[in-house]
Design a protein with these regions (language model features):
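Conserved short alpha-helical segments that host acidic/polar catalytic motifs at enzyme active sites
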Residues: 1-197, 201-227
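A short, hydrophobic C-terminal helix/tail in secreted or cell-surface proteins
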Residues: 228-232
Length: 233
């Protein structure tokens, strides 16, 4: 954290440890051959089979995570691909499970590839750059304009340009949505920590919840949706 890094393209990530213990070796991003870097939300369910195949190709594994197979798969695919996005489009077809991915390659240093399946991913459209996150809350300090990727989308994100392809490889135009959420709603503000903020904001949260449900000094709550949900299940 204390080391300053120069550059205009980068990825970083924090997540729960779904495979392996929390450790430096299991931390993201995962790197293959000092060429491909990957951050990943989700679970690759067939990672054991992929890992065994990659070991036969000479790949060595440094972590216990499922994410490392993604980096190696892309590194191998790049050898027969003209672009990074083409490589990603090829390899994601072999992944079973869910993923929200941010991918970089030293061979294509001006871009990040983002793709999702069963895991949310949002692109932030800024005036001085573009961003990737699993939730718009993480980007509110940078921009209020967002593109929400759809299932199977693969996006090429550059400093001043975003190009998106759908699951079938067709070039698509996803809408840019302006968020109404204020940055102050997701930071600590003047509080020492988030728990303190949550405690002191409870009255306002209750007020906001009940405001549209009070009629003639009585609280009206509709259980129609809950009943419908119970019936469906």
């Amino acid at each position: 954290r204390s080391n300053k890094i120069k550059g205009n393209v980068g990825i970083a990530h924090t997540r729960w440890a779904t495979h392996g213990e929390p450790s430096n070796l299991n931390a993201h991003p995962h790197i293959s051959k000092n060429s491909v870097s990957v951050v990943h939300n989700g679970i690759i369910e067939n990672y054991v089979a992929l890992k065994n195949d990659q070991k036969k190709l000479g790949y060595e594994f440094k972590s216990e995570t499922d994410t490392e197979v993604i980096a190696h798969a892309i590194d191998y695919s790049i050898k027969s691909s003209k672009t990074l996005i083409e490589s990603v489009q090829k390899v994601v077809k072999s992944f079973e499970g869910s993923y929200g991915l941010g991918i970089m390659s030293s061979k294509f240093p001006d871009q990040i590839i983002a793709t999702r399946k069963g895991s949310p991913l949002v692109l932030g459209v800024g005036s001085n750059g573009n961003y990737i996150a699993s939730d718009q809350m993480a980007l509110l300090s940078k921009t209020k304009k967002f593109i929400f990727l759809e299932e199977g989308d693969v996006a090429e994100v550059k400093l001043d340009k975003i190009t998106i392809f759908d699951l079938d490889g067709n070039l698509v135009d996803r809408p840019v949505i302006k968020s109404k959420i204020k940055a102050g709603q997701v930071d600590k503000g003047n509080y020492d920590h988030f728990m303190q903020k949550e405690i002191f904001e409870q009255p306002q949260a209750i007020r906001d919840t009940l405001e549209s449900r009070i009629t003639n000094n009585s609280v009206t709550v509709s259980y129609t949706h809950l009943r419908a949900h119970e019936t469906d299940s």
